[in-house]
């Protein structure tokens, strides 16, 4: 425990909060060709690689991911949620923050149903998270 005198002389240091999705905190001014510190909730990017990855120890699966080059020039790894996808190289996608706990280095999610990404087919519950449209009512 510091004394009052020590606190008067030195003071408390502020804790630096590190962002969990740093690529969304950088912008790019293409006219001036400089990086800017403009945060955004989502960013657009182009897929450079689409593939599968195996998760960390207790889990076992083939998780779908895409390597995405964002409009600010940063390349990130993003998870493709849902069953089945239509992404391939050069697909334009929208990413949001949010890590995948069992995939190391994956800090972003691709938003389904936006830009080139199709929504999940035949999804009835939690549709908004997967870009699925409301199913048509069958006439009797």
Curated annotation (Swiss-Prot):
GO terms for molecular function: rRNA binding; structural constituent of ribosome; tRNA binding. One of its GO terms (cellular component) is small ribosomal subunit. GO terms for biological process: translation. Pfam families: Ribosom_S12_S23 (PF00164). The modification 3-methylthioaspartic acid is found at residue 102. Keywords: Methylation, Ribonucleoprotein, Ribosomal protein, RNA-binding, rRNA-binding, tRNA-binding. CDD domains: Ribosomal_S12 (cd03368). With S4 and S5 plays an important role in translational accuracy. Belongs to the universal ribosomal protein uS12 family. This is Small ribosomal subunit protein uS12. It comes from Geobacillus sp. (strain WCH70). The gene is rpsL.
